[in-house]
């Protein structure tokens, strides 16, 4: 991520990575190899359309039919996103949970959250104590109602109280479940992480993730730049990609901005 001067700026940068998470990917896809390359494809397509004004995804299976983008260009760009983790495998073995990352807090924000957490814990303890008391009283009433020699008037009175306690317990169960689900916690947002071992991507022949071709070093679209970025081994290269996209010498980004401004003139 970009350098940041404040905790708030750091949090905003993390939230911004949610752009790569959003989309219509089938995260329950049974073929996980296909799921992975589909996610990479979607992230690349979003980036291409939003910032470069080009449908790069058309070159996934072959050289672009209209724009000057080769299949090699596609996989050079795709490599930047290969090292980005969007979904992950849970402890239950389900590889379909979207990444939710914790956001940093200022001291004031943390103090405010601590206050809310204490108030929530106190309320939850009170609700559970009320439920326990209601359960205990209902059990006592059930035992009394088992007596065969209870006067009719007394039985009616005890039955009414027992039924009221049963309703009360159901209500408290719902309140406790709701309170536990919406408990205050560390602020979170959908976002992405770099994988432990990022790297270049192999060409998938005709888009088939199980038919692999040669490895293509990460790089930019040759139509706009022939430069090869220097990427640290433990990083995905998204930082270098962002620098290239926003660079003064990138004619594609400039064209997109001009067209958007012209649209509003």
Feature-to-residue mapping (PLM):
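Sequence context surrounding c-type heme c attachment/ligation sites in exported
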Residues: 6-111, 118
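Short, functional "switch" segments adjacent to catalytic/cofactor/reactive centers
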Residues: 11-12, 17-23, 88-265
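General structural signal for alpha-helix termini and helix-helix connectors
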Residues: 3, 60-64, 147, 247
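Low-complexity, Lys/Gly-biased intrinsically disordered segments
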Residues: 1-10, 209
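Short amphipathic alpha-helical surface patches that mediate protein-protein
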Residues: 1-2, 82, 263
């Amino acid at each position: 991520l970009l350098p940041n001067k404040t905790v708030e700026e750091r949090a905003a940068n993390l939230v911004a990575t949610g752009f790569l998470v959003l989309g219509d990917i089938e995260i329950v896809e049974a073929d996980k190899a296909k799921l992975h390359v589909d996610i990479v494809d979607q992230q690349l397509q979003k980036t291409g359309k939003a910032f470069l004004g080009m449908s790069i995804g058309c070159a996934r299976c072959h050289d672009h039919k209209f724009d000057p983008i080769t299949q090699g260009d596609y996989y050079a760009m795709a490599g930047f996103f290969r090292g980005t983790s969007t979904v992950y495998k849970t402890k239950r073995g389900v590889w379909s949970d979207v990444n939710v990352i914790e956001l940093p807090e200022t001291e004031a924000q943390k103090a405010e959250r601590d206050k809310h957490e204490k108030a929530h814990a106190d309320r939850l303890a009170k609700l559970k104590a009320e439920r326990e008391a209601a359960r205990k009283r209902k059990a006592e009433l059930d035992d009394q109602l088992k007596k065969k020699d209870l006067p009719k008037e007394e039985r009616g009175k005890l039955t009414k109280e027992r039924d009221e306690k049963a309703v009360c317990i159901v209500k408290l169960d719902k309140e406790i479940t709701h309170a536990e689900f919406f408990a205050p916690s560390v602020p979170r947002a959908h976002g992405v992480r770099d994988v432990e071992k990022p790297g270049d991507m192999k060409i998938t022949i005709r888009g088939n993730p199980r038919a692999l071709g040669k490895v293509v070093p990460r790089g930019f679209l040759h139509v706009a730049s022939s430069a090869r970025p220097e990427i640290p081994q433990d990083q995905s290269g998204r930082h270098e990609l962002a620098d290239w996209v926003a660079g003064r010498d990138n004619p594609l980004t400039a064209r997109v901005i001009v067209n958007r401004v012209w649209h509003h003139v």
